[in-house]
Amino acid sequence: VGDEVVVYGSVTNYMGNTPETATGEAYLYSLKSNGGSTGGDDNPGGGTGGDVSGNSITVTASAFGLENAYDLTASGLTLTDGTTVTFEAGGNTNGPKYYTSGTAIRMYPKNTMKISSSKTIKSVVLNCVEASGTKCVADGKIDATPGSVAVDNLTVNVTSINSKETTITNSNPNTGTVNQLRWSSMVITYAE
């Protein structure tokens, strides 16, 4: 009660007194809790939202239960600890998407992922995948603001963040699988 819920999509009136949306035609755009009960899952993108251990949270892309080719610019993700992950196309015609093939989130050239938390973020580790023998780490062309990026095989390490938010960008200007950033899991570590 008292919460603000914004849903994007067409609403119809069922039986004269119940607003509803067509399955798969609408999504939760935002949820602002004003101290009331949400009455359900307030996790855009669905799923578990990560496993907290000590001062870190581990997120597996497949655990969110997203459909194949799910467009992440539509709603982003909310983790169990309240951290949000939002995605932007960044000028690319293809925005970040989740694919069941490879169970990974694909970030195409110019795509961004912004991680925001109420806690200070120390580091982020993206565990990436291969596609037909090609390592999908954007050919090493990844930036973080704030943060320093180092790529080691299929692992992208973002360190020296020391902020409550960071934006990770696939800075590779080229197209093709080798220029995509595809991650299957992520570990966010917070400052103690």
State what each model feature region is.
Residues I168-L181:
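Short beta-strand-plus-loop segments that form exposed binding edges in beta-rich domains
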Residues K119-S132:
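A short beta-strand element within beta-rich, extracytoplasmic domains
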Residues S184-M186:
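Extracellular beta-strand elements of beta-rich domains used
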